Swiss-Prot record:
Domains as described in the record: ValRS has two distinct active sites: one for aminoacylation and one for editing. The misactivated threonine is translocated from the active site to the editing site.
Annotated motif 'KMSKS' region, positions: 552-556
Region (Disordered): 1-21
Database matches in CDD domains: Anticodon_Ia_Val, ValRS_core
PROSITE patterns noted in UniProt: AA_TRNA_LIGASE_I (PS00178)
Native organism taxonomy: Bacteria, Bacillati, Actinomycetota, Actinomycetes, Mycobacteriales
Protein name listed in UniProt: Valine--tRNA ligase
Length: 903
């Protein structure tokens, strides 16, 4: 081993190796490294900089929450982009923040008050309760920030925002008034998702669907005499018949042709009658071909009711109890009424058939757990037609590019078919709707710098959380004021998010972003060709993180993974690299403990390789002259340049998985497994040599660039190793590798690449042959082969070292041989393994291996022969089992062949 002497107290490679710990322990360094980056101001953006701007806004996590695996993926990819752009010389603003999460936060605080004080929010006035929420936010709202630091987010903490900050509240009031004045906000009675427990409308994303065992009940409307007008309808919600106003049939259904236009009496309500209407919505082949219509409590019925101008009586109050029907059922809960109404109908002889159990999908409140009630309610809405068109045009015209392009149709499907958006919520926590009502039923919208007239009362509702989130890209930079941040960093460069909130958040940001730009181009800039400016020029949509079997992570399955557990057990780099290495655009990502362990092992491999290189004199001082390099030297620096080109192309197109997979393969399979092993031969054990010094420079040169390329995905381990290698301040502010940092931009040496390729094949085949012969890996054996014939004479020492073979003596007698086809010739390798193999022990070992291989073959064959497994298991799992079966079959054949040879 060569150690550079420490003359004149200069820092040497050995000194730097000594600074590294004995082994890689991420927990010992990550927190201090991160705080050092923050303290140094590396993440703080300067709007006055003359560097080109690059900006990302963090999709704001709920203040109530903790980071889950989806967040971890989001943050890893955004951080990788931010770190790379910073290294490329951009002025980077990655702006963090949190969402006030109206329903989630209010629910959390109400639960806390019930547990600690035995009170509900109604025991306080509105201002007192909101003060309680702010207290809770101050005490518990910092959890996510701590977790973001733990995974290494390079965000600008000096610009952290909260959706209820004063500046953002001003933006909300401003956009609301502009939309209202433009006639794009209105109030109406519409069907909404209603939570009887929370007593508010909720958004679609806050509704989760569960399979529920119910009963399908067939009811007879009209006469009980078969010869007189009647119809039979089926429902799982018998109680809603209290609000039935019609029965619908298909226009072409001959069975009901004479009934269309007639009315049937309601079994319980004299104030309602059931009109028989014809509508194409009805499937005449399903059931009886007749459908009961409850316009105020079913989305499809509501749409049909609008088409036929039907009455829409609401039969439930805000708590979900039957109300205002004038029947004996008033005051009952939905569940109680379901039983009582069925009993009364049965008593009248109107229950024709019951199917129990009947499994059907029912929407439930994500926050409170009860079944959602579709309910006609007076709410505020955004008229989306004009806004949605601008959003669609922005993508169609290329102002915003969606990655991957394959998800464009999904985006267009949403924006082209969007319904008006319910924006009011019956909560106390959130942005209060800036509508005021006068004493004579006047309605005015009050802007941020205006006061309502005396005697006016503000609307009690708050805005949907997504309303303020839709302003996030520009409200966080100071809009509606003119700010240096907007001038430098708007529009944002890219939005990174999962495809599942494409409608809920992304489309709405596009709507409000283009509208705000149209209204205030002097603040947000002009778009292309007279179109409004967009909030982001690129939209990268990644998939969802799933478990290792491809299943959605859920509490019911118990398969969720806490990313903080991985940080604790494997380190932040392992978490990040696992996610980055699996992040293909728009494709779901399965992960498991094996993935994290593999990434941790990779970090350890990098650490050990760098420490070994430093102990062997690696220096980052630039490359020697090209002609002074060996084949192996030229091959590795040329390969590094190809990897750099590929990684740049991949990352420019958000192909994170391909970029990191290529870096992994290069680092582990090419640099560590091959070049480091050859370098051991090229660096003399004692003394120095020109070739050895050149190899030390190549080692340092390649590691320097490799660590910088890996830094966006693995910031912590690369920082520690790069500082040790280069003795410089921080890799965070190092430059991103260019051709000058790889092979100097010269033409690739194809001959060197060919010869190293031959070495890899030769060594691999000889190693495999040795193993088949039962020769221990450490055992040297004499061997004869013609290095000149295969043009590998300059690499003979490396080959002999790598495969543990010695020069043959004069009396050499081969006991085994193999032929290997290389690029220039087929070479025969003759080996003398006599005396190196214990035949009895080798047979015993092989028989044990054979038993294991046969057991694996039997296990996989059993699974692949199971039709239930094949039909239910994800394709990736089945393919993995098939791969295992093939490997086991090949192993059985190989071992049997070797046993025959021993016999």
């Amino acid at each position: 081993m060569v150690c550079v002497t420490d003359q004149n107290n200069e820092t040497t490679s050995q000194n730097r190796a000594d600074k590294l710990p004995k082994s890689w322990d991420p927990k010992a360094v990550e927190a201090d490294l991160y705080q050092g980056w923050v303290d140094a101001g590396y993440f703080t953006a300067d709007p006055a900089s003359d560097k080109p701007g690059f900006s990302i806004v963090l999709p704001p996590p709920n203040v109530t929450g903790q980071l889950h695996m989806g967040h971890a993926l989001d943050h890893t990819l955004m951080d990788a982009l931010a770190r790379r752009k910073r290294m490329q010389g951009f002025e980077v603003l990655w702006l963090p923040g949190m969402d006030h999460a109206g329903i989630a936060t209010q629910t959390k605080v109400e639960e806390m008050l019930k547990e600690t004080e035995g009170k509900t929010r109604y025991d306080y006035d509105r201002e007192e309760f909101i003060a309680k929420v702010w207290e809770w936010k101050q005490e518990y709202g910092g959890k996510i920030g701590e977790q973001m630091r733990a995974i290494g987010d390079s965000v600008d903490w000096s610009r952290e925002r909260f959706t209820l900050d004063d500046g953002l509240s001003r933006a909300v009031q401003t956009i609301f008034k502009k939309l209202f004045d433009a006639g794009l906000i209105y109030q109406a009675n519409r069907l909404v998702n209603w939570s009887p427990v929370l007593e508010t409308a909720v958004s679609d994303i806050e509704v989760i669907y569960k399979d529920v065992e119910g009963e399908l009940v067939s009811i007879r409307y009209g006469s009980l005499n078969d010869d007189e007008p009647h119809v039979i309808v089926a429902t799982t919600r018998v109680e809603t018949m209290l609000g039935d106003v019609a029965v619908a049939v298909h226009p072409d259904d001959e069975r009901y042709k004479d009934l269309v236009g007639q009315t049937l009496p309601h079994p319980f309500r004299d104030d309602l009658s059931l009109k028989v209407v014809a509508d194409d919505y009805v499937d005449p082949e399903f059931g009886s071909g007749a459908v009961k219509i409850t316009p105020a409590h079913d989305p499809n019925d509501y749409a049909l009711g609008l088409r036929h101008n039907l009455d829409m009586p609401t039969i439930m109050d805000k708590t979900g109890r039957i109300a205002d029907t004038g029947t004996q059922f008033d005051g009952l809960t939905r569940e109680e009424a379901r039983i009582k109404v069925r009993e009364e109908l049965a008593a009248q002889g109107r229950i024709v058939k019951e199917i129990r159990p009947y499994v059907h999908s029912v929407g439930h409140s994500e926050r409170s757990g009860e079944a959602i009630e579709p309910r006609l309610s007076l709410q505020w809405f955004v008229k989306v037609e004009e806004l949605a068109k601008m959003s669609g045009d922005a993508v169609r015209e290329g102002d915003t590019t969606i990655h991957p392009k394959s998800l464009e149709p999904r985006y267009f499907d949403w924006v082209d078919n969007m319904h008006d958006w319910t924006i009011s919520r019956q909560l106390w926590w959130g942005h209060r709707i800036p509508i005021w009502y006068g004493p004579n039923d006047e309605i005015i919208c009050v802007g941020p710098d205006e006061q309502a007239p005396e005697g006016y009362v503000q609307d009690p509702d708050v805005l949907d959380t997504w309303f303020s989130s839709a302003l996030w890209p520009f409200s966080t930079m100071g809009w509606p004021e003119k700010t240096p941040e907007l001038e430098k960093f708007y529009p944002t460069s890219v939005l990174v998010t999962a495809y599942d909130i494409l409608f809920f958040w992304v489309a709405r940001m596009m709507m409000f972003g283009t509208f705000a730009a149209k209204e205030t181009p002097e603040l947000l800039g002009e778009g292309k060709d007279g179109r409004p400016q967009v909030p982001f020029t690129d939209l990268f949509l990644h998939g969802l993180v799933r478990d290792e079997h491809g299943r959605k992570m859920s509490k019911s399955l118990g398969n969720g993974i806490d990313p903080m557990d991985w940080v604790e057990n494997y380190g932040a780099d392992a978490l990040r690299f696992t996610l980055a290495r699996g992040a293909n655009p728009g494709v779901d990502l399965p992960v498991g403990e094996d993935s994290a362990q593999s990434s941790r092992n990779f970090a350890t491999k990098l650490f050990n390789a760098t420490k070994f290189a430093l102990m062997n004199g690696a220096v980052s001082e630039g490359l020697p002259a090209r002609e002074e390099l060996t084949d192996a030297d030229r091959w590795i620096v040329d390969l590094l340049e190809q990897v750099r080109l590929d990684v740049d192309a991949y990352l420019d197109n958000y192909q994170f998985a391909k970029a990191n997979e290529e870096l992994y393969h290069f680092a582990w399979n090419e640099f560590c497994d091959w070049y480091l092993e050859i370098a051991k031969v090229q660096i003399p054990r004692e003394g120095t040599s020109a070739q050895g010094e050149n190899t030390q420079k190549v080692l340092g040169h390649v590691l320097d660039a490799l660590l910088r390329l890996l830094h966006p995905a693995m910031p912590f381990v690369t920082e520690v190793l790069w500082q040790a290698l280069t003795d410089r301040t921080s890799i965070v502010v190092a430059s991103w590798p260019t051709a000058a940092d790889t092979n100097g931009g010269v033409a690739v040496d194809a001959d060197a690449a060919r010869r190293i390729g031959d070495v890899e094949k030769l060594v691999t085949e000889v190693r495999r042959f040795r193993a088949d012969q039962g020769v221990k890996p450490s055992q040297k054996v004499p061997a004869r082969l013609d290095f000149v014939a295969c043009d590998l004479q300059d690499l003979e020492d490396s080959v002999r070292s790598l495969v543990r073979i010695e020069q043959p003596e004069d009396d050499f007698a081969a006991s085994a041989s193999l032929e290997i086809r290389l690029s220039q010739a087929t070479i025969t390798v003759e080996l003398d393994t006599s005396g190196t193999v214990d035949v009895a022990a080798e047979r015993k070992r092989l028989e044990k291996d054979l038993a294991n291989a046969q057991k694996e073959l039997e296990t996989t064959a059993k699974k692949l022969g199971n039709e239930a497994f094949l039909s239910k298991a994800p394709d990736a799992v089945v393919d993995k089992i098939r791969g295992r079966a093939q490997i086991a079959q090949e192993e059985v054949e190989r071992i049997n062949k070797r046993l025959e040879e021993l016999a």
